């Protein structure tokens, strides 16, 4: 393992912290848009989105999106990074980050940054289902959506899959697709899911 770049690590952790703050911000925004009796429900839906997404991302979501071998350009091998395998190791009772990504910051830092985007993406969908869904149904939806929609889309766009700049579709049409700010994975993905839910 090479040397950790402390500047890159600090910047990614700062960025992850700021993105984490977006989810409660969206919760309060959506809470202000619903009737007074539905504010608590909206806040709880956002809290469920945050909690379930973090659990799914830790178990297998990150692995589907970023770890291991590519399966048809659609998703990564869910078992290759199950439970963030090989990104942290316990040494003398202390968890230590192992492995560096291409920018010399720990993989575990990248996991934190990416889960923040996964959480805000699910949180954006909440506005479409205000006062329309039971809490338990929403939790099941979040688990399934992160597993079968968000993580594969993140893989396809951000990890060299079908829709990436180097992907098969870009090569077939002769024009590279670039998604630097998350327009496809975050905004289009959440908008289409919200539209499908309300229809």
Regions found by a protein language model. Give the residues of each.
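Hydrophobic alpha-helical transmembrane bundles of multi-pass membrane proteins
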Residues: 1-199
């Amino acid at each position: 393992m090479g040397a950790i770049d402390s500047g890159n690590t600090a910047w990614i952790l700062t960025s992850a912290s700021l993105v984490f703050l977006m989810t409660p911000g969206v919760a309060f925004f959506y809470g202000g848009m619903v009737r007074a009796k539905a504010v608590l429900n909206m806040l709880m839906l956002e809290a469920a989105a945050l909690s379930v997404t973090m659990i799914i991302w830790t178990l297998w979501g990150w692995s589907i999106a970023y770890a291991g071998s590519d399966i048809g350009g659609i998703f990564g091998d869910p078992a290759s990074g199950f439970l963030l395998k090989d990104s942290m190791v316990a040494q003398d009772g202390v968890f230590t980050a192992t492995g560096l990504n291409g920018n010399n910051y720990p993989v575990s830092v990248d996991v934190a940054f990416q889960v923040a985007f996964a959480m805000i993406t699910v949180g954006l969908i909440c506005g479409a289902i205000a006062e329309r869904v039971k809490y338990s149904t929403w939790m099941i939806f979040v688990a399934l959506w992160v597993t079968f929609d968000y993580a594969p889309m993140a893989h396809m766009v951000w990890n060299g899959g079908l829709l990436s700049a180097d992907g098969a579709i870009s090569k077939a049409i002769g024009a590279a697709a670039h998604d630097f700010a998350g327009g496809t994975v975050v905004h289009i993905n959440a908008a289409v899911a919200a539209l499908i839910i309300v229809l």
